[in-house]
Amino acid sequence: MALTTDFAGIDPGTTTTEAKTDYSRYRIVPARHPGRAAGTIFAALVIAIVLYSTFTNPRWGWGVFAEWFFAEPVLVGLGRTLLLTALAAVSGSILGTALALARVSKSPLLASLSWGYIWLLRSIPMIVLLLVLNNLGYLYETISIGVPFTDKVLFDYPTTQLLTPFAAAFLGLTLNQSAFFAEIVRGGILSVDQGQLEAAASLGLSRRRQAFRIVLPQAMRSILPTGFNEIIGLAKSTSVVYVLALPELFYTVQVIYRRNLEVIPLLMVATVWYLVIMTVLSIAQHYIERYFSKGAVRNPTPLPFRAFFRRFHRPLPATADGRSDTGALAAFRSVTDLRAKGGAVRIHGISKSFGALKVLDDIELNLPAGSVTAIIGPSGSGKSTLLRAINHLERVDSGFISVDGELVGYTQRGEVLYELKEKDILKRRTDIGMVFQNFNLFPHLTVLENIIEAPIQVRGLDRDEAIVFARELLARVGLSDKIDAYPRQLSGGQQQRVAIARALALRPKVLLFDEPTSALDPELVGEVLDVIKELARTGTTLVIVTHEIGFAREVADSIVFMEGGHVIEAGSPTQILNDARHPRTRAFLAKVL
């Protein structure tokens, strides 16, 4: 039935007068906001009254203020305040970062030591800490460094001469600052998505590289606002060191107004200088936050002097054959570096439990080199856990996994298996690439930086060589024009294609796909599946967890059906999809086909 027949009395052939009206000639009257206007007038009146009262009252002593604002004693005190602030901010931030990393360490004793330090230093008032440090010479006459349990002394110096008032002030401010800054950094670290750590680990990046290249740059977006609050508070806290008779800005002002009795003008001298310091710090905070917001916004505002510094950037090396990509997907078969024999994966009776829930139960699988295996099954059947176990992101409770006869997570010496340390496991992971369900691209790095990070840091490739190969991979996934884009500026399908290119950059023997299309809109699924189809012809061993049954039929050599942590049935696509033997397999396929 035609849609127009459902609306009685409306003739679709007629055109109403309203539809013919040309609104472009109408004058637009902006919305009125009387409350906003009243608020603006009130704010202007308050500002005018305050300024008038301040600058017309002679008791403020602006003449005395002008006389002392640039006076030499004040500037010397200001310099000491700035020096203390800078030294304590830098050293406190470094020590605080180390304490934060210790707090999230897997060593219980190290984490407890860090917690105890933070608890103690946050509990002690600043003025008490400064006085204790200033009187440390009473407790320890000398500071000695020597060889433990021997009489050999390497360093010996009187405490009172070593711990001057300036040194005591610097040490006290640093210790106090580090305790508070440690919790700020820890909060920033915890704010970074766990998937970022898993992605970095799957690429084989070292723990140090994960921390300083992946986690901390992202954590800075959370750290900076509260961190700069602490630095601003530190600048003002330097006034507390007056208890050590150290002539910083506030102490110097106190000495002057006690002599000339001009209290208010001299206090205003200190106040305005503190305002100047805070203003400079606030401006610095603004630009530093903008720098670390890379990738967080789709259209970032260019930083000052960006054009100047870009002149010193090295141009990217061209690809070997000078090809350019027009956005069309090219065949991976033409990429020489990707035509390699995949690794054979053998899964020997692995089991895994999370508390009382057994997610994998005595799994046995043999995946030949160069094969394409699709794992299907209902949600919660253990499919993703199995993938994570293959590259040791999830440690199994029992059983073993090998790639080309080499055990994952262990090294064999005779008839003894030794569990590998984390750094050795990271090296093994370079042969097992993984593409995550939620992409897990590093948002603060460009597309190019995402791809070349692991080849340079893990494989030891020359940067130019890594860039050439990255550009080749991007051409193959149809994204050469996105080389300088950030992940947030890409669609979901584009992000997943970049994730595939990133995993391929390590030239792995085995490539794992964890539901690569589940986070995509239906319109974007096809472009990712096309890439995987081309990969299936390169010889790399592919293991794909998917709900795309039609895709599994087309690309897979074998299909594995899982439920409740068990492999219910495995076989060729024809056997599983057309002639499944197990009733549970048939029931599942009846719902999804």
Regions found by a protein language model. Give the residues of each.
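Catalytic Walker B motif of ABC-type/P-loop ATPase nucleotide-binding domains
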Residues: 511-514
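H-loop/switch region of ABC-family ATPase nucleotide-binding domains
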Residues: 546-547
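A short, surface-exposed alpha-helical micro-motif characterized by mixed small hydrophobic
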Residues: 552-554
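Transmembrane alpha-helices and adjacent helix-loop boundaries
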Residues: 2-318, 579
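Conserved signature/switch motifs of ABC ATPase nucleotide-binding domains
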Residues: 485-488, 506, 538
